[in-house]
């Protein structure tokens, strides 16, 4: 006589006990092979990091300016390199990418150098001589991407002087009076980064001017600097505070007129904020003229 089929209630505990046994066995195996599990986890983490680094091209060696992603320049990425030589056109630097174990050892690197120029600095002849003496062939240095024009990269050059102390060669040249500040090519002139960079460069230049270092020993150079600074200030102030002509809006409503005035007022306040440093420069220039007359 056939047995009656087992009830569903009796099958459920058997299934639960079976699943529990599987979990127990897996846990026991993991405990017995804990080091292996840790090594697998570490290997997966390292593999993930390596894939991430390769995805953002940090391990790629750049031999021309066109190799460098636009995003690198926009984010002002710092790259490491080895100086090859200094020419009239700029510095030729061999890029040194991040190396990965077991990959970089057998990977054949392309050959080539990047043409790097000092961003925001116009070197004098004395400045070129000083730079030749300061930097040696094959010297390691960092260059921070700020702009690009054709095949040239405009960068901050950073040289390590021991420990965590890096010297910004762009500012150091200006502090010694071995160059003049110029606009950084390839950089968005309306960005906050532009004003921050030029503020630091102008501060370095003013240090040399106050001490009479380098080219600022000559009174003619000082006068030329003051004249250009004054003209530049007047041009920028007039441009940023240029209000809409009243005759063009005579037919508009009163509300739209007040709105336009309010917008212009806000724009003027922003201009004052952005050019606060130039106000300090004007004050400094006025004091120098006063001392000269005295």
From Swiss-Prot:
Query: Which cellular component terms (GO) are annotated to the entry?
Result: extracellular space; membrane
Q: Identify its membrane topology class.
A: Single-pass membrane protein
Q: Keywords on this record?
A: Acetylation, Membrane, Transmembrane, Transmembrane helix
- InterPro entries, A to Z: C3orf33-like (IPR042421), SNase_OB-fold_sf (IPR035437)
The residue range of the signal peptide is none
Its GO biological process annotations read: negative regulation of ERK1 and ERK2 cascade; regulation of DNA-binding transcription factor activity
Gene3D superfamilies to which the protein is assigned, alphabetical? 2.40.50.90
Residues bearing PTM N-acetylalanine: 2
Q: Where is this region: Disordered?
A: 244-271
**Membrane-spanning parts:** 36-53
Compartments, as annotated in UniProt? Membrane
Which protein are we looking at?
Answer: Protein C3orf33 homolog
What species does this protein belong to? Mus musculus
Q: What is this organism's lineage?
A: Eukaryota, Metazoa, Chordata, Craniata, Vertebrata
